[in-house]
Amino acid sequence: MNENQRDKTRREMILRLVIHARKDSLISMRAEEMAKYMDVSKVTMYKYFSSKDEILSLVISHFANYMCNKDVLSTYEGESILERYQKTFEQSLMINYYFPESFFNDFKGYNPRLYEEIVDAQQFRFKHLEEMYRLGAEQGVFYPVNTAIFILEDELILRRILDPSFLVQHGLTLEKALFDYYEMQKRKLIRQKYLNIMDDSWIEELIPSFVAKNSRNL
C-alpha cells in the first residue's frame, strides 16, 4: 500500500470513529471500542495507528481542518455573501452534530495541548465569520450583528435542536426544527431586499439529506 492510500484509509477510519462515537467519550473509550466504531479489528487498527494518543491527536486534526476549511470560510470569485453564509450554516450544523460540548470538555481535562488546538481552530473560524458579517454589513446585505453572540446562538440552539428529548417535548420533527432555525437566523441577519431574492434550494436539499442520514444516531 502506498503512502497516499494509507493516509486515505487512516482518514476514513478516523471519520467513521467521529461519526459513530459522537455520544461517547473518546478519552475513556477502550481500543476495542474504537476499532469497532472504525469497523475494523483491533489488530488492523494498530496497523494504521501506533497508539490511542495518536488516534486522539488525529481526531483533533480532523476537527481543526474542518473548522478552518477555506472552502467554507473564504469568498471565491462569483460567489455571493449569501452563498457564503449558507455554507457557514452547514458548517455550524455539522460541528454541533459531530462535536458536542462533552467532546471539548473531555479534551480540556485530558490533554491541554490538544485542547489548545481546538481553541486555535475555533478562534480561526471566529475571525473569518466576523470578517464575513462585517463585509456583508458593508455591502448592505446583512444587518450589523455581534459575531460572538450569533455563534453562541448556533452552539446553544443547534445542540438543543439535535437533542431528541427537546424535539419530543415540543412536538417537533428534526427537519422542521432545523428549517425553522435557519429561517429565524437568516431573517435576523439578512435585509429584506436580499431575502426576497435569496436562493435556498441548496439548504432545502441539505436539511432533509442531513436528517435522513443522521437522525437515528441522535
Per-segment meaning from a language model:
Residues M1-V40, E54:
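Basic, helix-initiating cap at the start of DNA-binding domains
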Residues L26-I27, E138, F142:
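Conserved hydrophobic residue
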Residues S51-S57, Y66:
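Short amphipathic alpha-helical segment with a characteristic S/N-K-E followed by hydrophobic residues
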Residues L58, N69-F99:
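Hydrophobic alpha-helical connector segments
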Residues L93-E116, E130-E131, I197-W202:
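Amphipathic alpha-helical segments used for helix-helix packing
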Residues R113-Q139, A148-D163, D180:
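Amphipathic alpha-helical packing segments from all-alpha helical-bundle domains
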Residues R134, G171-L218:
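C-terminal peripheral helix-coil segments that are non-catalytic and often amphipathic
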